[in-house]
Design a protein with these regions (language model features):
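Short, acidic/small-residue loops that bind anionic groups at enzyme active sites
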Residues: 3-4, 82-106, 113-115, 160-167
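Accessory alpha-helical/coil subdomains and C-terminal extensions
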Residues: 68-70, 76-80, 109-231
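Short acidic, glycine/serine/threonine-rich loops at helix termini
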Residues: 11-16, 50-52, 77-82, 100-105, ...
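C-terminal non-catalytic interaction/assembly regions of soluble proteins
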Residues: 211, 215-317
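Glycine-rich oxoanion-binding loops at beta->alpha junctions
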Residues: 10-68, 73-74, 105-118
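Short, structured coil segments at secondary-structure junctions
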Residues: 34-35, 84-85, 154-155
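Short, ordered loop/turn segments at secondary-structure junctions
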Residues: 2-9, 43-44, 71-74, 92-98, ...
Length: 317
């Protein structure tokens, strides 16, 4: 069975029947091509404040083992509940932020990445038509994986991520060099939603990237001031479009392999493990070890950052 809306379902003692054959009477499994979640998600309220009721709901439903499909924040909460209630818990990483430790893949990341790259492909044409700098703000919370991967794959000129400090002077110099040296009159900037203020503003606590319109607008305003309004910018905040859509083939394969191994672990009575993808196969790690290492940040000296620099992308100082 499935538990609808995570711990809310345990509170209300609700279950949803699941079948290997899917919901279609003709035997067509719609789940592979469905985005999001058929069970629903929960991201509000103080879950641990209702711990006793949740634990009672778990016992009332008589669950033998629980597979939690979640990102790092939800994993921390569900693990605390599992420890309190002595649950048999298996975790599967599912987040577009790609910030769960130890795993090279998380369900949803590849689909979101493809959505962003598709958006960049479309926005390049309007940027080129009007000789504009298009600033694309993407999700990622406190990590820059989505911005870094999509920026490289989409041919961005500037990528800004939380893990690498940057200067507005450096951005404007790069944009000017693109125009003067390479005669490129437009540019694409990919901005992660979790970036901090530029180095020029780092010592000024009164300045924040949390403007009414987000970090993309902060960068646009800084570029306008730096260039004396000679650089024409437009901001596109992709928002929740990144969290939906038809799952990519890679995400379908990853989810299927994670699911198979999760069931195998339950059959072997091996619990308190999170599944991870490393070196082309599914492996396991103790959940507590994963939580201790979360979130998984971009390595500023890593191969992807160095690849971006080698491609002539400005990615900070």
């Amino acid at each position: 069975v499935g538990i609808p809306y995570a711990t809310q379902g345990l509170l209300e003692r609700k279950t949803v029947p699941l079948s290997i054959h899917g919901w279609d009477l003709r035997g067509i499994d719609p789940l592979l091509s469905m985005g999001g979640t058929i069970l629903g998600s929960l991201s509000k309220g103080d879950t641990l404040a209702h711990a006793n009721e949740i634990l009672a709901g778990y016992q009332a439903i008589a669950i033998d083992a629980l597979i939690a499909i979640s990102g790092n924040g939800s994993l921390n909460i569900i693990h605390q509940l599992a420890v309190l209630g002595h649950w048999n818990l298996i975790a599967i990483p599912k987040t577009i932020d790609h910030d769960v430790a130890f795993t090279e893949r998380s369900i949803g990341f590849d689909t979101a990445l493809n959505t962003i790259v598709d958006a960049i492909n479309r926005l390049i044409f309007t940027a080129a038509s009007h000789d504009r700098v298009m600033i694309i703000e993407v999700m990622g919370r406190s990590t820059g994986h989505l911005a870094l991967y999509s920026g490289i794959a989409g041919g961005a000129d500037v990528i800004l991520i939380p893990e690498v400090p940057y200067t507005i002077r450096g951005i404007c110099h790069h944009l000017t060099e693109l125009r003067d040296r390479w005669q490129k009159k437009f540019a694409i900037i990919v901005v992660s939603e979790g970036i901090s203020t530029c180095l020029e503003d780092a010592n000024n606590p009164s300045i924040s990237t949390n403007t009414k319109y987000g970090q993309g607008q902060y960068i646009a305003e800084k570029i306008a001031n730096c260039s004396h309004h000679l650089i024409d910018t437009r901001v596109s905040v992709l928002g929740h479009i990144q969290r939906g859509g038809i799952p990519s083939a890679l995400d379908r394969l990853t989810a299927s392999m994670f699911g198979k191994v999760a069931v195998d672990l339950i059959a072997q009575n091996k619990y308190d493990q999170m599944l991870a993808w490393q070196n082309g196969k599914v492996v396991t790690f103790p959940i507590q070890d994963v939580i201790a290492k979360n979130p998984s940040l971009v390595n500023p000296q890593g191969d992807l950052v160095q690849t971006a620099r080698s491609l002539g992308i400005y990615i900070g100082e």
